[in-house]
Amino acid sequence: MYTNIMVAVDGSASSRQALDEGLKMARLHRARLFAVFVVDKSILLSYAGRLDPNALIEEVRHDGVAVLRDAERTIAHAGVNGDTEIVETELGQDVAERLQHYVAEHAIDLAVLGTHGRRGIRRAMLGSVAERFLRTSICPVLLVRGDDATRAAVAAA
């Protein structure tokens, strides 16, 4: 049923769980998995004048390389055919839009995202990204709640 599966990764526990679920789906459907890390330039450029935006972008790219190395090891260990890629937002584009563009570029037929990403300047906020992505998605979406979200929901019940 699925041939190309995209998983958005940012190094958070939620995105690692999304990768695990994406790998299960890829094995089940013998699909190719694409792990994607997005550098959100728009958030980083808002610090211009106080911090060097180019240095911040390079730092996020460096983080992306580390996150994707881990994803590559996980994909290889699972025995799934997969690729990893760092992509960057364009001026005026948010992370959800960039992921939608990636979906169209790579004929993705299932997108997998964690519901809670890393917070702060060194990450692209996947929690709100997941919601925006879901609203505009051109393909089926699997949202994966992280352990922290599950624990909080159970504690609140």
Which role fits each region the language model picked out?
Residues 3-52, 74-83, 149, 156-157:
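Small/aliphatic-rich secondary-structure junction motif
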Residues 110-132, 150-154:
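Glycine-rich, Arg-bearing micro-motifs that act as flexible, cationic patches
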Residues 50-54, 101-103, 129-130:
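Short, hinge-like loop/turn segments at secondary-structure boundaries
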Residues 73-111, 149-151, 157:
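Structural beta-alpha unit
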Residues 53-66:
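A short acidic, glycine-rich active-site loop
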Residues 129, 137-138:
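Short, structured coil segments at secondary-structure junctions
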Residues 37, 86-88, 145:
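Residue-level recognition of beta-strand->loop/alpha-helix junctions
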Residues 141-151:
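Short, flexible loop segments at boundaries between secondary-structure elements
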